[in-house]
Amino acid sequence: MHGFEIRIQDKIYSLVADTQSEMESWLSVLCKVTGVDMTTGKSKSASSGGWFSGKNRVLKSTNFRESLKQSKHPELMEFARETDQVNAKRRQEGRNKIFSLSFLSPNINGAGDEVKEVDIPHERFGKRFLVQCDDLKFRLSRSFDSVSSVNIEPFFITLALFDVKENKKISEDFHCDVNDSVVSEMLPSPENISNGVGEYEHHFSFPKKAIFSVTFPHPDVYLVLRIEKVLQGGITSCTEPYMKSGDALKKGAAKAYRSAEIACQTLWRYRMPFALATRPLFKNNQGDLDDEKEWSPIYKQDSGKLSDDELLKLVEDMAGKEKFKQQIIPATIKMNVTSLPNDLANSMTASLLPVRPFNDKSKIQPTLEVQEFVPAIPEAVHPHMVYANNFYVYPLMLNFNNQKVFSKARNIAVTVEFKENDTLASSPLKCIYNRSGCVVPSFTTSTNTTVLHHCTNPTFYDEIKICLPVHLHNRHHLLFTFYHVSCEQKKAASGAHASIKGKPAVEMQVGYAWLPLLKDGRIVHSELSIPVATSAPDGYLNSRFGGLGKNIGPDVRWLDGGKPLLKISTKVVSTVHTQDVHVDSLFRHLQEADGTPASERETSNSLKHLFVADNSVIIKYLPTILNKLLHVLIVTKLDEVTKDTVRVLVRFVSQLHDVNRSDVLHSYVKYSFVTDQLSGFDKTVYEELTKGLLKFLKPGADPTITSSFLKHAWWFFEVILKSMGGHLIQNGKLQSNRETRYSKGFYESLEHLLQLFVPQILRRLKEEARVAKEANIHMAYFVKGCFTYIDRGFVFQMISYYNEQFKDADTQ
């Protein structure tokens, strides 16, 4: 078929001849009419315009008037100017951006994966805002020296975020201190602790500012303020003086102060619930802070509604003020909630790590970041960027109603310690984050829960935060010690209760419980119940209740027949210890693997179990997981392990695309992946990955894996290309001959890859056209990338072969 086009005025005429000679005869006639030389393609008067040489010749000229200068029809010149203007105008109408129509355009779905811009990895947050705690003043007050009107006793404030819609707590506790210095002096100085206060720890012993973050902000997120005081007695009797008015308030101030002063000297270790308040935060789901909202009144704490579930119900009831009838304690809260400024300096992470810029000698009080408990869903989590290794313990409930051993146990406190062995001479580890409020080290060896007066089955809401060691073993455990705390000061002072382990006489031990931190090699992170024993003998971790009155291990007497009396909950926020059983199993196995056949088979089993790993955990640990899998490729000796590894990689890449998290894959390739260079191994990632992919392109391979690979082949090709470049850098081959940069086996693998890849595309052209199109684009980018590294003659051969496999109908 032979043809050409003629443009006359505003129309284009296409002429097609059956033979070359016929087309040339037509051109001869047209050239004779227009005065154009057929052999040179130029007008006989050397004016502009002419023919474009090629298979399809096109008659071209600058404009209509130019083409008529040598015409044998000069009368046409009369309207030439007007015709040119009309043509120029019409050419601008309805023009298409033809380059955007190219099938290689990054705007077309499926092609953007290779050219997507990737941000430098950084720590990601939700909506962040600053909370500054300035003051808390109760109407019941007293003057101290020159200071006018301060609280009569110290108060301890805890702030946390609660999501009423999701019915859960979404942040850790922030303990802030708003006590005046003269009030804080009512508390005794702590005893010396080995490895005690650091040089700059006093800077954040009295924190007042915190940075909160909310990934999914909405109007039902509340900031909840809990107020505690030093243990004195029942909540009702302790709040009564604060709710008086007039002369009764003034008369009661002195008496209340004297009682508080005595309590601070003897019971300062223990706190009791006192009151609470709430504040809504957001106007809408976009995270706009509601500046017009204020704190609710301070409500007396109900002793029967201490749990987080009960608190969430209270918060919901507070929103409907006409139905909420809780007693109000007159007080004023001064706490500002503002957007986080961009120039905030001297802040610290939730693990007390300084954030640059940070001046440790500055007198500016640091701002503490509060850990958000991000939902474990793919769209909310990100790969870990900042070290964290914290363990949260929540004692929930203790049931001493039916135990007969400690009949006087009423005001029960739970002391929590973290220990690395169960010998009597061992000391607890100093790794529990200390609560603020007095000059203490950042970490302590033990902490206590709040005490509920005269209650044998208390409910707790305390959060104990522990900084975990990097390496854990089976002897690491939590030790819970239960104390009955006497609130009767006269009896306590006269030594009515025995002093144990140097504790003040106000305490009496009433039981022990312990919880090993690891179960089947993994950290326990769930809600569970454990029994309580009367004592903790040497080697108590080996003791457990066997049922039917039998005891296993050291002789221990269990309360209430060994029933699980203590209910607790735990949570892990760690970049070191995973929470998915399958990911954790792989990590532990690879750490212990020795390359033996038995070890290789175990590796294969661990890889197969990764198919059911949680997507959110995969995203959090993605760089580490992918590094481990690519490492397995170059150290394994079994083809089965190679096949399982590639299958898992394809599965992960496909899953992350399905949940719209391909961004973490882009980030990994560009910023995290580094070619693994191991001494004693001549294998490379690019060669082993290419060989592994061949197994899933051959006839009879798993069609699901094959289809997933074709759709997301860009990631594997990008890893191969980057590994090829890394190989040249590490081996100093950047300046070497292209033909000798890579082994002959790798060239053969590339050839086989192409030979197997094309039939997969052709097979899907009709029924899975989208998959075929995406695979075609991925291969095009890969071949383009090969020009940078390998013999370009070989690359052109690849292109030639690729094109030869397609018929004209296939390219439509």
State the predicted function of each range.
Residues M1, K44-S45, I799-T811:
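Short, intrinsically disordered, charge-balanced linker/junction segments flanking boundaries
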Residues I8-D10, P330:
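Glycine-centered tight beta-turn/hairpin loop motif at sheet-sheet or coil-to-beta transitions
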Residues K11-D18:
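Canonical phosphoinositide-binding patch of PH/PH-like domains
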Residues L629-L630, I761, V783, I799-Y802, ...:
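Buried hydrophobic core positions in alpha-solenoid tandem helical repeats
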